[in-house]
């Protein structure tokens, strides 16, 4: 039997591929159209396991684009390799193929109360946000990410559900 140290087990766990955006806090079970945890739409949460790779990639890409928009408005990642090193050293899971701004979100989401110097992680806050505490900034990131996801749903998804329901009612 092979024995691994705790550090090696954490390393293996942190580098397992992330197969779903789920963060374990699904609010769609309570009727939300957009999950407050992972920001997927209710039908994406329900149908995820039936999606093919292209459908899953489309969801991942939308989530990435919205999150990057939120993050770039408040901070700059100036050293991607340092950020990656810090994530790996702290066993924080991240999607390697995503933008470093998504990585920054993962780091801040998990370490906002412990991080004292963002520059040590390859990031810096933009001037208008330098007086914010990281836990408040983390909450602002999450709130804006949710609001953008909700707006996207209302603009592009809800009208098609309404149209489909009306067409079925006429059938």
Segments predicted by a language model, with ranges:
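Extended hydrophobic/Leu-rich segments
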Residues: 1, 5, 94-95, 118, ...
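C-terminal, charged low-complexity interaction regions
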Residues: 115-171
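N-terminal cysteine/histidine-rich coordination modules
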Residues: 2-76
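Short flanking/linker segments adjacent to small metal-binding domains or redox-active Cys/His motifs
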Residues: 71-128
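Generic detector of well-ordered alpha-helical segments enriched in charged/polar residues
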Residues: 19, 23, 57-64, 84, ...
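Intrinsic disorder/low-structure terminal segments
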Residues: 3, 10-11, 93, 128, ...
């Amino acid at each position: 039997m092979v024995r691994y140290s705790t550090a090696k087990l954490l390393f293996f766990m942190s580098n397992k591929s992330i197969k779903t955006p789920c963060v374990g806090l699904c609010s769609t079970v309570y009727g939300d159209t957009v999950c407050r945890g992972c920001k997927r739409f209710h039908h994406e949460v329900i149908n995820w396991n039936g999606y093919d790779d292209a459908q899953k990639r489309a969801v991942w890409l939308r989530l990435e684009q919205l999150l990057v928009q939120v993050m770039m408005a408040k901070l700059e990642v100036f050293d991607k390799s340092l950020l990656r090193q810090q994530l790996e050293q702290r066993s924080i899971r991240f999607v390697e193929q995503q933008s470093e701004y998504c990585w920054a979100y993962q780091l801040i989401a998990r370490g906002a109360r412990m991080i004292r110097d963002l520059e040590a992680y390859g990031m810096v806050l933009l001037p208008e946000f330098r007086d914010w505490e990281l836990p408040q900034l983390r909450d602002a990131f999450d709130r804006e990410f949710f609001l953008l996801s909700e707006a996207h749903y209302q603009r592009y998804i809800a009208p098609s559900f309404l149209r489909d329901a009306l067409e079925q009612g006429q059938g």
